[in-house]
């Protein structure tokens, strides 16, 4: 039982995975380790499911685009092996029996491995087929089915077991109810051109291919015991596949009448012959099966269907309904074909009666054959004979089958591949039938006989009529050459045989025989209709005649084809047809046409006509119009010839039966009947000619069809007259009834004719024979003429087709040349376009490069210009520094020269002082006169000051202007003090200055200790340094001290200048110059001091605001300390005053303007000090209530608004910051009124305080009229402005006055120029020097 392991179910890898668990009911280990058992997979998929999962257009996954996968990545996916045609080696592998190959390989006997390893399938009997270990590369000769060698196609979707019953069957007719089959690619006809394909097959099989017998011998079992004997010798048909008429079966378990007939070795080799019997019961079938496949086994067994599901055999045995075929398998039913398996199915339409009758005959012939005869495949015997039993024979002679099929099989491929002339020759070849009293000896084809040297039956030629003595009991065979059309030879089992009645009564009814012959004629004509569709198809469906579609129809240029069942399929586009053609589904004989064509043509003819595969892209041909009349005429000729042949045969058979009946009557001593009336023959002829086929449909055959006419050589009538022999044996008994075993319509049994003894009978027969001979000759002449006419028409048609083909080839050549020219032109245009694009791209790159270079050059140029500009700026700055240094040196030199001049003047003054002391007395005398002059001068100065004040328009709150004017007026009216008093005052002033400096230093140190981290950055940080803010009272007190000091100096000067009397104009000019000098000194000692205040110790100078050089008093202090007499002082001052006169005159206007601006700034500064009086408190409270938007710094805005003089500007600022509301307008009006009152209240105490100060220093002095006048004018001016504002407020838009400059400390830098830099600040002229 170990050998049966080769029939395990499932693929090999599944059995190996299973490890023996549940994969087989046999517990014994397998014979070879090469067939291990595996565990079954949890999920199994059928072929259709796996193919459905394959999508050709799927994109490559993104993960596989990595660089590491590039060497092994293939752009185009490999198609599934089910869609790839087999190579020749794979076809040879598939044509072998897997059981035989596996057993022979395991036992080491013969059957070496084939050259090509199995591809994409398991070597053992596994259903599933994987791709195998390696990767598959198509060889260069693995092409699709073409004209020459076309490999036999098999359906890749089926493994050996799935194919099971249909492994070797011919692609026969399908079940009409099932899905229409696709294309059986039986390219085996083309394989006959390749002798290697034929010879290679016989070396594959071992000496004995009956593997069951081989195993029996190995196991030492007897030939006559066990199921193996039954399987090998007895009921071999049990193992045959079922009939293709039914659906696919599962194997042995089907009932015998559901099984397909299949001779496993009948047509393949003589060593393994299988009878064609379908008899036998279920019990016998069980006896002939191995025990491991019986249903009473221990475990449940079954098979796997195409979806991978397990099917129990018990369940399947209970189901009597046949399983429906899988749709795709039904549509794509490709099966392997042996060289001689064209006729594996012969008696598809036989009745059960015929099947049963030839069973015994087949069994006897099988027993006479040896099992393993030779390696070569022997010719296959098919019963083609008419068995005739002699009259007195007790047992029938042994049947010698006629070996015809091999020759016919070889004849057919040549018909398919050669020109129509060869077909005509084949159809003309006579078939000689030797008729004897026991058997039809042989049927052969003479011109094919040389190909079959091993035929056991000779091919006799036509023999002349021999006379045999009447005493001879041995009847010589009657040789009758019969010409059988190839279609009849090819379909011997297609037409049901005529079964004669078992007993032939002596009074045979002639009408019955005539009716019988008419039925046979009808069958023959019906076969001709069917055979015209396909020589191998007997019951094909003939579709309607195709008609051409108009060009405008969308399906006009789509493709239609006729499937093997004769049905028209379509329309399909070019892409679908091309894919099917490349997949190998189409044979060269497939009938195809476009929608616009009128007729179908074979694909091979279409390819020749088009010059290419018509489905591929290219120019299309005009619609092909069918030559329907010619086809119809040819077909009619064939039918006429066949009808004539039928008529002759029917007449001959009828005459034979008449003679036989006549002889029986003569033997029964009956009077001879009259000859058959001419009316009966005419009626028979009329009825035979009335059987006409309708106009034949257009068939799937090529346009040139085979001839069905009667051949030239060999005549039906060239036969021995039966009456000659009948007359020699008058003593013979009537013939026993015999069964007719022939497979042709005309192989009717001819019973032995009793010999007539009467001379009249012989004469009558001779006359009839002469008449028949004449009719026969006329029929032959007519047939010859028709044959010649047909040949001529065929020749003309062939010539026309050749011309058409040449024309199409020339057109195709011209079209190809035109296409090549167009292709070259397109390539040139493409090259020019690419060249132009390349030039454009280069030009763009060049332009970009130039643009980049230009941009880079521009950047470099800009950098160079920037560098040059910086260099020029640096050089200019250096030049300015050099110029400033030169000017400083020049100033220093001038100062030194001035010091030298001052020293010289001092010496001169000392000398002159002595002279003045001498003249002092004289001056006292003149003092009274000089006082008068001074009084006039004071009045003149008052007028000048009033004019200046009118120009300056000082506000009422400016204290310094009043004080300076007061000081000037006082200095002129004071009496000269003594020198000791002046020195005391000077010492007192110096002491106060030192105390003030010491106090300022202490404050500065304290501030620096509080802010030790404060840096001294540039000029922008000056405003951020802490200011030693003083109250208004302190500032006024210090200013009063300065004014007192100036008055002291002026008194000293007056005392020095009083003794020498001078003319009045000179004194006037001197005093004017002194006053201007003093004014300029006062300007220098203004509130803000000089620019040197930027330094951190700006409060360490001698004055209140820190003039660094103390230029206002340095010169006069020295003069005072010299204590020179008055005369020298006046003399020494005269040149100096002259030198400074122009300078004072030119700068007086500027000084007054600067004093005015500085006073305004000081007002703003005082407001920043937040002198919180009642007016300011009211102002801030009101602003807080009005500041609803919370966007105003109230203290700063109040102090700023307080210093704005113009009522217009006050209203503008209030409107801008507080909004144009009634509350804001009311606030502005109240603000102006309160400010005016406060200014009046502030001016009165200040005037009183000034009077007190003047009284404390100089005694009680009256306030100068100019000061009072100025104050009055200012008050009047403010009142006028207020009134003017009130009157104009209701008018139109106000004109803004000039805005007051802000405190420079708020800006963070000083607006005054440095005193060390020239050309900055005031404009100086040459006259200033």
From Swiss-Prot:
Q: Name one Pfam family in it.
A: GYF
Which spans does this entry mark as compositional bias, Basic and acidic residues? 150-177, 251-271, 316-338, 352-376, 403-415, 781-896, 909-928, 983-1001, 1035-1049
**Bias regions of kind Low complexity — which residues?**
377-397, 899-908, 929-951, 967-980, 1002-1013, 1239-1254
Coiled-coil portions: none
| Regions of compositional bias (Acidic residues) in chain numbering | 293-302, 339-351
List this protein's GO terms for biological process.
insulin-like growth factor receptor signaling pathway
Bias-annotated ranges (Polar residues)? 720-732, 954-966, 1068-1081
For this chain, the annotated S-S bridges are none
Q: Where is this region: Disordered?
A: 109-184, 236-419, 720-740, 781-1081, 1122-1155, 1236-1256, 1279-1302
Domain GYF residues, every copy: 556-604
Q: Which GO terms describe its cellular component?
A: cytosol; membrane; perikaryon; proximal dendrite; vesicle
Q: What family, per the record?
A: Belongs to the GIGYF family.
Self-association state and partner proteins as the record states:
Component of the 4EHP-GYF2 complex.
By what name is this protein known? GRB10-interacting GYF protein 2
Q: Which organism is it from?
A: Danio rerio
Q: Identify the coding gene.
A: gigyf2
């Amino acid at each position: 039982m170990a050998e049966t392991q080769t029939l395990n179910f499932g693929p090999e890898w599944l059995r190996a995975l299973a490890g023996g668990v549940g994969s087989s009911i046999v517990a014994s280990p397998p014979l070879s380790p090469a067939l291990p058992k595996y565990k079954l997979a949890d999920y199994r998929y059928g072929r259709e499911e796996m193919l459905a999962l394959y999508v050709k257009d799927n994109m490559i996954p993104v993960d596989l685009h990595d660089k590491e996968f590039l060497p092994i990545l293939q752009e185009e996916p490999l198609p599934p092996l089910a869609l790839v045609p087999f190579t020749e080696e794979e076809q040879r592998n598939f044509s072998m029996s897997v059981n035989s190959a596996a057993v022979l390989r395991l036992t080491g006997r013969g059957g070496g491995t084939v050259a090509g390893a199995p591809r994409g399938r398991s070597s053992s009997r596994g259903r599933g087929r994987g791709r195998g270990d390696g990767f598959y590369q198509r060889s260069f000769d693995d092409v699709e089915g073409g004209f020459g060698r076309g490999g036999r196609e098999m359906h890749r979707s089926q493994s050996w077991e799935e194919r099971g019953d249909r492994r070797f069957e011919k692609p026969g007719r399908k079940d009409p109810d099932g899905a229409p089959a696709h294309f059986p690619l039986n390219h085996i006809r083309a394989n006959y051109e390749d002798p290697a394909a034929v010879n290679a097959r016989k070396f594959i099989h071992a000496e004995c291919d009956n593997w069951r017998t081989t195993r029996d011998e190995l196991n030492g079992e007897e030939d006559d015991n066990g199921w193996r004997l039954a399987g090998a010798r007895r009921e071999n048909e049990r193992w045959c596949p079922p009939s293709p008429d039914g659906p696919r079966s599962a194997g042995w378990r089907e009932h015998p009448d559901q099984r397909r007939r299949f001779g496993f070795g009948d047509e393949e080799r003589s060593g393994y012959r299988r009878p064609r019997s379908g008899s036998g019961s279920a019990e016998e079938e069980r006896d002939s099966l191995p025990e491991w496949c019986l249903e009473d086994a221990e475990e449940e067994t079954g098979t796997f269907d195409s979806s991978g599901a397990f099917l129990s055999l018990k369940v399947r045995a209970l189901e009597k309904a046949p399983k429906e075929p899988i749709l795709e398998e039904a549509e794509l039913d490709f099966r392997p074909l042996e060289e001689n398996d064209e006729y594996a199915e012969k008696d598809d339409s036989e009745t059960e009666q015929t099947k049963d009758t030839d069973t015994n005959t087949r069994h006897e012939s099988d027993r006479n054959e040896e099992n393993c005869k030779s390696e070569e495949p022997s010719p296959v015997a098919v019963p083609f004979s008419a068995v005739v039993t002699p009259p007195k024979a007790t047992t029938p002679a042994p049947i010698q089958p006629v070996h015809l099929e091999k020759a016919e099989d070889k004849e057919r491929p040549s018909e398919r591949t050669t020109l129509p002339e060869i077909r005509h020759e084949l159809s003309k070849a006579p078939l000689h039938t030797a008729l004897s009293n026991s058997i039809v000896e042989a049927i052969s084809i003479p011109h094919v006989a040389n190909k079959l040297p091993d035929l056991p039956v000779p091919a006799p030629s036509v023999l002349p009529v021999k006379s045999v003595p009447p005493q001879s009991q041995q009847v010589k065979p009657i040789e009758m050459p019969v010409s059988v059309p190839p279609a009849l030879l090819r379909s011997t089992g297609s037409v049901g045989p005529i079964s004669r009645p078992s007993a032939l009564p002596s009074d045979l009814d002639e009408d019955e025989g005539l009716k019988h012959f008419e039925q046979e004629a009808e069958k023959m004509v019906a076969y001709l209709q069917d055979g015209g569709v396909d020589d191998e198809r007997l019951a094909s469906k003939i579709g309607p005649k195709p008609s051409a579609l108009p060009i405008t129809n969308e399906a006009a240029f789509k493709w239609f084809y006729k499937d093997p069942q004769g049905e028209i399929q379509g329309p399909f586009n070019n892409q679908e047809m091309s894919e099917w053609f490349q997949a190998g589904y189409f044979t060269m004989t497939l009938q195809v046409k476009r929608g616009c064509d009128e007729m179908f043509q074979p694909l091979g003819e279409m390819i020749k006509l088009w010059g290419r595969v018509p489905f591929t892209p290219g120019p299309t041909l005009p619609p092909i119009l069918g030559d329907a009349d010619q086809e119809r005429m040819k077909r009619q000729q064939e039918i006429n010839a066949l009808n004539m042949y039928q008529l002759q045969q029917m007449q001959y058979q009828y005459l034979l039966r008449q003679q036989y009946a006549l002889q029986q009557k003569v033997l029964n001593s009956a009077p001879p009947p009259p000859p058959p009336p001419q009316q009966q023959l005419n009626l028979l002829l009329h009825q035979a000619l009335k059987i006409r086929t309708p106009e034949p449909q257009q068939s799937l055959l090529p346009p040139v069809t085979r001839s069905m006419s009667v051949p030239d050589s060999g005549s039906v009538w060239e036969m021995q007259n039966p009456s000659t022999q009948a007359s020699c044996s008058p003593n013979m008994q009537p013939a026993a009834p015999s069964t007719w075993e022939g497979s042709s319509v005309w192989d009717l049994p001819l019973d032995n004719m009793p010999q007539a003894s009467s001379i009249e009978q012989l004469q009558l027969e001779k006359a009839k024979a002469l008449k028949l001979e004449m009719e026969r000759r006329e029929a032959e002449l007519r047939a010859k003429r028709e044959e010649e006419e047909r040949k001529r028409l065929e020749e003309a048609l062939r010539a026309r087709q050749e011309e058409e083909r040449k024309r199409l080839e020339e057109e195709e050549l011209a079209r190809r040349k035109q296409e090549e020219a167009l292709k070259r032109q397109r390539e040139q245009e493409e090259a020019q376009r690419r060249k132009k694009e390349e030039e454009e791209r280069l030009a763009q790159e060049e332009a970009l490069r130039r643009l980049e270079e230009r941009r880079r050059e521009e950047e470099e140029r800009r950098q160079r210009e920037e560098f040059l500009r910086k260099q020029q700026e640096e050089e200019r700055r250096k030049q300015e520094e050099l110029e400033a240094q030169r000017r400083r040196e020049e100033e220093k030199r001038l100062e030194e020269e001035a010091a030298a001049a001052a020293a010289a003047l001092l010496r001169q003054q000392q000398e002159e002082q002595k002279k003045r002391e001498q003249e002092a007395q004289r001056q006292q005398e003149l003092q009274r006169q000089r006082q008068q002059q001074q009084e006039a001068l004071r009045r003149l100065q008052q007028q000048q000051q009033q004019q200046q004040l009118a120009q300056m328009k000082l506000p009422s709150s400016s204290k310094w202007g009043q004080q300076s004017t007061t000081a000037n007026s006082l200095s002129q009216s004071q009496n000269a003090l003594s020198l000791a008093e002046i020195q005391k005052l000077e010492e007192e002033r110096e002491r106060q200055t030192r105390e003030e400096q010491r106090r300022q230093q202490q404050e500065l140190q304290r501030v620096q200790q509080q802010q030790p981290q404060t840096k001294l950055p540039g000029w922008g940080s000056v405003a951020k340094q802490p200011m030693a803010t003083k109250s208004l009272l302190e500032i006024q007190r210090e200013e009063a001290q300065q004014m007192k000091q100036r008055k002291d100096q002026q008194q000293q000067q007056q005392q020095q200048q009083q003794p020498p009397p001078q003319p009045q104009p000179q004194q006037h000019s001197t005093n004017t110059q002194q006053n201007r000098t003093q004014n300029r000194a006062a300007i220098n000692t203004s509130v803000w001091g000089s620019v040197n205040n930027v330094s951190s110790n700006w409060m360490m100078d001698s004055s209140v605001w820190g003039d660094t050089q103390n230029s206002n008093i340095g010169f006069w202090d020295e003069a005072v300390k010299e204590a020179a007499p008055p005369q020298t002082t006046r003399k020494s001052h005269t040149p100096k005053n002259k030198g400074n006169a122009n300078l004072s005159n030119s700068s007086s206007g500027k000084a007054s303007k600067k004093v005015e601006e500085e006073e305004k700034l000081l007002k703003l500064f005082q407001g920043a000090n937040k002198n919180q009086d009642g007016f300011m408190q009211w102002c801030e409270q009101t602003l807080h209530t009005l500041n609803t938007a919370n966007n105003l710094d109230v203290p700063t805005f109040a102090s700023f608004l307080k210093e704005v003089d113009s009522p217009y500007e006050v209203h503008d600022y209030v409107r801008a910051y507080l909004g144009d509301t009634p509350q804001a307008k009311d606030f502005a009006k109240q603000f102006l009124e309160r400010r005016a009152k406060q200014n009046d209240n502030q001016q009165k105490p200040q005037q009183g305080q000034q009077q007190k100060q003047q009284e404390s220093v100089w005694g009680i002095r009256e306030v100068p009229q100019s000061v009072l006048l100025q104050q009055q004018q200012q008050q009047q001016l403010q009142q006028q402005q207020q009134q003017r504002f009130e009157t104009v407020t209701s008018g139109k838009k106000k004109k803004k006055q000039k805005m007051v400059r802000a405190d420079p400390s708020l800006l963070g830098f000083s607006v005054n120029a440095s005193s060390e830099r020239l050309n900055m600040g005031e404009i100086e002229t040459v006259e200033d020097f």
